[in-house]
Amino acid sequence: MSAGPQSDFDGKAFAAQLSTAPGVYRMYAGDDTLLYVGKAGALRKRVGSYFNGTPKNARLTSMLSQVARMDVTVTRSEAEALLLENQLIKSLSPRYNVSLRDDKSYPYVLLTREHWPRIALHRGPRAVQGRYFGPYTGVTGVRETLSLMHKLFKLRSCEDSVFRNRSRPCLQYQIGRCSGPCVDLVAAPDYAESVRRATMFLEGKSDQLGEEIMQSMQQASEALEFERAARLRDLLSSLRSMQNRQYVDGRAADLDVLACATQSSQACVLLLSFRDGRNLGTRSFFPKTNGEDSADEILGAFVSQYYAEHSPPREILLDREIPETELIEAALSTAAEHKVALKWNVRGERAGYLLLATRNAQLTLVTELTSQSAQHARSEALREMLGLAEPVKRVECFDISHTMGEATVASCVVFDASGPVRGQYRRFNISGITPGDDYAAMRQAIERRFRRAVEENGVLPDVLLIDGGAGQLAQAQAALADLGVENVWLVGVAKGEERRAGHEALIMADGRELRPGAASPALQFIQQVRDEAHRFAITGHRGRRQKARMTSKLEDIPGIGPRRRASLLKHFGGLVGLKAAGEAEIARVEGVNAALAARIYANLHGLALPDAAGESSP
């Protein structure tokens, strides 16, 4: 008999309250790992199909058994859902999309970042440095765009190998679709201006570009440069006839769309963002309220606080008027150094954006309230299992991660009765211990976290979970005793038989062991917190280890001091960009000659290092 989904997530109930509109759905595991992103022509029907009957294959069964929650984003059409799905898959890399989807990638328009940039169709990994515009739903749209770009701005399309070896202009120049930079038929400043205009067009700023061209045409006419004025007139005519404002092609201007939904003293603010003409998807926030705040007050406070830390676009759409609009506009404009407009009475396409955001805010809030109810039940079960008199308001969990003692990192995650409090997560880079000594690492992390709490009279957890057995728990006990910390309930979470989930042993500070079993809501809560601490520790460890290894590679290269190392990293935007560069690109960095570039390239790719004479070392 096939096994159905084993998580506590009620997929049928979730699907039943969804809209029949098109959209994108996201499946998450208990530790917030993104499992899958999919699109739907009708969300209720598509999501419900996963939970009606037996999964079609073992991989789908495995995926569904891990689902702890789902999020959805409503769109206006299935085409929009398709594009948003692709963007989320590319940016978030869900675990199961790699195998469950066709790996064919959508096409983009690529504008390279070179002295003489080229424009071309691109599929696959973004290995080439430059800007990528899209995605497009098909190759036809890209080719039409490229044809227009060559006609309007005369940018080159040839590969570098062809560009570097030409002695006379190609056919593209002869038919007026390239300005001939390969043989110096266009000045560098003029070509750069064409690139700037092309970028504006691809960013969806065709109105602004049209105004610029109109002004240039008038100036040329006044200067009696009639031939140039005629060229600009033709350019403006072609631009206006080919302007495309289709939502699915990402031609929307840069803007944010905000909607606020409230229910049962809870609030959800949903942010829908567009940047460079691309729909970046939605993000949900759940601000804490006093239960009496109105939706417009909540939204107004959110706008002020959120954009104090994030650069605002020029236009922000709101689903309602907020208090002190003019004051907030002035403050945002001053901070951003450009005009910021807050709008709520809008029509046409922008009204559609507001409707999308409003529907998604309402749906997200309903989902959150359902999730919070389950979380409260698990928290209450934990209180009962531990025999605590008061509700469990705060739980912290520590975990250690390293690779054979290298780059040891400790994590501390925080949960309250409503779930994770990610803003209070902490990582500790462990040092000064014997590599691989988990006991010493745990003690150092506990001491650092609670010493600060003691010195600053900070908040303490009701329950402190330690990922480990009696030895780890003893280190935590000793550290708290040395600091004089009391009234914190300590629990060690030891792995069960064969490390199977649901078989964990809970070790109390007095030595007692509890084995509540897989069906226990209290253990499920502990597993959720422990798994989140594990994920957070591993992520920090991997980042620290990678940084140490890559940085040491640069430090080991003769001729690379701190200044050159900083120049290289700044030029390529980090180690990943540097590793993707070729020798010729590396040699363009100030202070790096061809020989040094060759040594850098060889070192980063594990090749034999050339010596000073240009010969490879053994």
UniProtKB/Swiss-Prot annotation:
UniProt domain GIY-YIG: residue ranges: 20-98
Disulfide bond entries: none
Annotated InterPro entries: GIY-YIG_endonuc, GIY-YIG_endonuc_sf, GIY-YIG_UvrC_Cho, Hlx-hairpin-Hlx_DNA-bd_motif, RuvA_2-like, UVR_dom, UVR_dom_sf, UvrABC_protein_C
Gene3D superfamilies linked: 5' to 3' exonuclease, C-terminal subdomain (1.10.150.20), GIY-YIG endonuclease (3.40.1440.10), UVR domain (4.10.860.10), UvrC, RNAse H endonuclease domain (3.30.420.340)
Protein's UniProt keywords contain DNA damage: yes
GO biological process: nucleotide-excision repair; SOS response
Keywords: Cytoplasm, DNA damage, DNA excision, DNA repair, Excision nuclease, SOS response
Highest taxon, organism lineage: Bacteria
One GO location term (cellular component): excinuclease repair complex
SMART domains: GIYc, HhH1
Function: The UvrABC repair system catalyzes the recognition and processing of DNA lesions. UvrC both incises the 5' and 3' sides of the lesion. The N-terminal half is responsible for the 3' incision and the C-terminal half is responsible for the 5' incision.
HAMAP family assigned: UvrC
Protein name, UniProt field: UvrABC system protein C
Organism: Xanthomonas oryzae pv. oryzae (strain KACC10331 / KXO85)
